[in-house]
Amino acid sequence: ISGKIVKGDNVITLVTDFVQPQHIYDTIKDCYEFEAMRNKLWYDREINELYLLGDFGVRADKAYRPASNRSFYTDGGFTLVPARETVMDGNIAVQDYPFYTGKMTLEKTITLADGEIENRSIEFSRMGAVITKARINGKALSPLTRAPYRFDLSGLLHTGKNKIELELTNNFRNLLGPLHLGGESYSVGPASFQHDSKIFGGGLNRGWTDGYAFLEYGLFFK
């Protein structure tokens, strides 16, 4: 769709024939009465999410606010904006990357004097990614996956300019969800993605919200 997106509102329309054979509807009806019938339920056709890929940021139209278990929440909607060239430490997801999934490399060049290159480390108060890697002046360090959240910089720094690169790898949580629960869940199932499901949730999902809940990720320095 490059070259077809315009400034302002854009509408993407997909047209298809969506039908299910009669036995699917019969099984759904049986699921209301017999719990075991859920194991026989599948769909010949499914409607999946549409993912927009590209070099851009996503800015929430409403403010973010904290939620449970290191998550945060916004009422939405969202606007595409140019990708940032710089980010601040802390939660990067609220800096126009709420749905971002994959790897992000952050780099900074610092200048050190003679007495500033010894006994140095990079420490984090908590993990802000699944894996955090570091390269100091091109030298790769062992990645962080668990505590202690610390990179030892002994022997890697020199007087003058030093290039520090941090590579964050996150998971699919903020892309695949569940996005419409009021915080971060300890466990999820089919009902976590549905507002009202008599089959998988026993009725109305009381934790449902029309807003969006994400999990934080970023650089949380100690």
Predicted regions and their residues:
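Aromatic-lined ligand-binding clefts that engage carbohydrates, nucleic acids, or primary amines
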Residues: 1, 12-14, 110-137, 164-166
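Short beta-strands within extracellular/lumenal beta-sheet-rich domains
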Residues: 1, 100-112, 149-151
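Signal that preferentially marks extracellular ectodomain short beta-strand elements
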Residues: 1-4, 25-26, 151-154
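Surface-exposed, short loops/turns at beta-strand junctions within beta-sandwich domains
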Residues: 4-8, 156-160
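An acidic-aromatic loop/edge-strand motif
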Residues: 7-103, 126, 163-222
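Residue-level preference for beta-strand/loop junctions
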Residues: 102-104, 145, 160
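Short hydrophobic beta-strand segments in globular cytosolic domains
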Residues: 141-142
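A short, polar/charged loop-to-alpha-helix boundary motif
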Residues: 145-157
